[in-house]
């Protein structure tokens, strides 16, 4: 149990160190306006990410049951059906977020002086949702088999890459909030694609050729069961973050300076909480 839990705890510590470093880089090299914009965007992205993370968590519970029972055919069927389901939700969520971005920012009461900064940041950062899905889907799949080390390794690679790219894009190239967004998306891509490739190569249950030979495919009855698990955990994970998003909207009404202070305060408060390690979610 300890060997399984320690990598997850280390991943959480790693994520919080990244959050503080990233906040410092944006605030130090770009300014209070950028920190306010990125801080509000972080709250919105955390809400969107939590929906996908919760759905991946629900699928992970089903994977664990199959591993425990050694029901390998059922496991493969769950993997195929759940991947298609959550991938589809990710694509829909990304498109809807892009289309409704202006109304969302209006509802969040983003001040006019940073509206352009936040819209520019969000326009780039939403592209990373697909990589958030990939990382968390395969991380929960690996953890369901008892492997919590590999997800930690790829989280560490993504975190280190994110901090390094932040310094390069923001501090050296002076790309501002666009640079911060680009750094985050590239780090998410590295972590998400990396863990996906690892799982596809190393996990025998994910052998595509064998799945095809065994006639493994999408099953409508399993989609309903998976959706039941995934939707409930997705809602559970996102409810608290939706509340924080509402608080962020109230904070935004007080102006840029208060928003910047709130953004820094939230990152510090995260050090005193213990969420499970999730992803490189944003600046």
Located regions from the model:
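Short alpha-helical transmembrane segments in multi-pass integral membrane proteins
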Residues: 1-5, 63-128, 172-230, 275-278, ...
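Signature of the first transmembrane helix
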Residues: 1-60, 64, 228-251
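Helix-terminus/linker motif at the lipid-water interface of multi-pass membrane proteins
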Residues: 17-36, 105-112, 168-175, 238-271
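Small-residue-rich hydrophobic transmembrane alpha-helices
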Residues: 35-95, 132-151, 261-278, 283
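Residue-level recognition of pore/gate-forming positions within transmembrane alpha-helices
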Residues: 43, 159-160, 185-192, 267
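Hydrophobic transmembrane alpha-helices of multi-pass small-molecule transporters
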Residues: 47, 162-163, 192-196, 271
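Alpha-helical transmembrane segments of multi-pass membrane transporters/permeases
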Residues: 86, 141-164, 178-185
């Amino acid at each position: 149990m300890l060997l399984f839990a320690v990598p997850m705890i280390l991943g959480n510590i790693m994520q919080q160190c990244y959050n503080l470093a990233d906040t410092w880089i944006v605030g130090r090299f770009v300014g209070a306006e950028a920190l306010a914009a990125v801080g509000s965007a972080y709250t919105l992205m955390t809400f969107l990410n939590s929906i996908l993370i919760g759905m991946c968590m629900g699928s992970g519970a089903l994977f664990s049951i199959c591993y425990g029972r050694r029901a390998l055919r059922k496991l493969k069927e769950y993997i195929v059906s759940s991947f298609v389901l959550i991938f589809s939700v990710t694509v829909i969520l990304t498109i809807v977020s892009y289309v409704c971005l202006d109304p969302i920012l209006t509802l969040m009461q983003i001040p006019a002086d940073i509206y352009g900064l936040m819209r520019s940041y969000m326009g780039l950062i939403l592209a990373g949702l697909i990589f958030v899905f990939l990382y968390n889907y395969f991380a929960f799949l690996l953890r369901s088999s008892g492997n919590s080390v590999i997800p930690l390794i790829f989280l560490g690679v993504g975190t280190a890459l994110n901090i390094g790219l932040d310094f390069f894009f923001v501090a050296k190239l002076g790309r501002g909030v666009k640079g911060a967004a680009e750094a985050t998306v590239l780090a998410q891509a590295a972590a998400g694609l990396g863990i996906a490739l690892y799982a596809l190569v190393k996990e025998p249950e994910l052998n595509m050729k064998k799945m095809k030979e065994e006639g493994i495919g999408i099953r409508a009855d399993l989609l309903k069961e998976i959706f039941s698990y995934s939707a409930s955990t997705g809602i559970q994970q996102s409810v608290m973050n939706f509340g924080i998003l509402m608080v962020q909207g109230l904070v935004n009404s007080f102006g840029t300076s208060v928003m910047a202070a709130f953004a820094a305060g939230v990152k510090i408060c995260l050090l005193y909480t213990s969420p499970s390690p999730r992803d490189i979610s944003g600046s």
